[in-house]
Amino acid sequence: MSVDSLYIHIPFCHARCTYCDFDTKAACGSQLLSRGDAYVQKLLRRVRDAARAGVLERVETVYIGGGTPTVLGERLVDIVREIRSYCNPVEFTCEANPESFTPELAFALSHAGVTRVSLGVQSLDDDELALLGRIHSSSQAERAVGLARSCGFSTSVDLICGLPGQTMASWEKTLDRACALETDHVSVYPLMVEDGTPLSRAIEAGRVAEPDEDLQAEMMDVARSLLTGRGLERYEVASYARAGKECRHNIAYWTGKSYLGLGRSAASMFSSNDYGACAELFDVLDDPSGASRIRMVQLDDEGTAFDVETLSSREALAEDLMLGARMSRGISYDLLRRAAAVIPPSRLLETLKEAVDLGLLGLSDSWDSLEAALSCDVSRSGPCAMPTRQGWLMGNQLYGMLWDLHEDARSS
């Protein structure tokens, strides 16, 4: 058994951002060198264990995230080379921050086998970057994207909207500058204020204004209009790409493929059969029978402690419906038929009709065609229900409706 995707987590940054609640440690100089080296040694042992178990043989995508992977310098290159010695993924992404993405490191990562770089730009306004606690400037970010492109990487840029003090004009300027860099991919996220972060404390103390959710929604819609007008098509609620440049790794997450996560706070997801084939890597779940899907998060550096969650068939299919509604391709007829095998078809149709009536989903065919396909009277393929513009903007409502299908709360 081999998983479809591999995620590697690097829990180090040169400095923590004001909004960040990720499992990362701020470290520099000799402290980063010693802590980072010890972490990488443990991580590589886990990679080798996975390779010996045959789990990496057919990996199609690899993603190294953080934290800030590029703070590791040459040790990051060692990780890439080690992984490449066990598999030949079609997409190999590494996250990078502009201030630590040097020409020397970019060249080494390219030669080691990284194919795609995702840059944590967040904003191209220096005042907004300072508020977020970012330690790079807008000009550094622009140079980093240019460097990545010159090394032959497929490039992605992360941006955040709805920042305190951010105006529609400054947001549009950031989007314009990002497009001018000719990046292949842009991810756009509304700012989330997490409890316990410096940003949260500043808002509570009245030093910073709380994000306006209505303005965030407007900014997300402006991003849609501007990015699609510049050749970047929306393929997921927060993701835009040029043709053929979609993030395959994230699509694997959204389509229920199995993935292995290695490193502190890395998440894995398996079917019960997949888990049985690689249980020696975890040794934490005695009997996964009855579980359709198993999700686990590594809690330590060594890979000896995990938080485990199991999903029933009904929960797994409700989750797949929810994830399908995040993507422009929407919910397929095949997924709908599989869902109808464990969720009462009348309940399923009731929820879809409610979403359509609310303007959150659009159907590719008539209701009669949909009902016939569900009853298996007609064999159909392709998408059957796709998110509308309203569905994108009111995603939380749509996703909640579909996830609620995992419960038996209403009779069919």
Regions found by a protein language model. Name each.
Residues 342-357:
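Short amphipathic alpha-helical interaction segments
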Residues 372, 380-387:
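A generic structural motif
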Residues 8:
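Conserved N-terminal Rossmann-fold NAD(P)-binding element of oxidoreductases
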Residues 2-5, 24-53, 57-342, 411:
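C-terminal scaffold of the Radical SAM
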Residues 11-24:
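Local cysteine-cluster metal-coordination motifs and their immediate loop/turn environment
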Residues 244-246, 354, 378:
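Short solvent-exposed loop/turn micro-motifs enriched in small/polar/acidic residues
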Residues 356-378:
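A short, conserved structural fragment
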Residues 389-412:
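Short, amphipathic alpha-helical interaction segments positioned at domain boundaries
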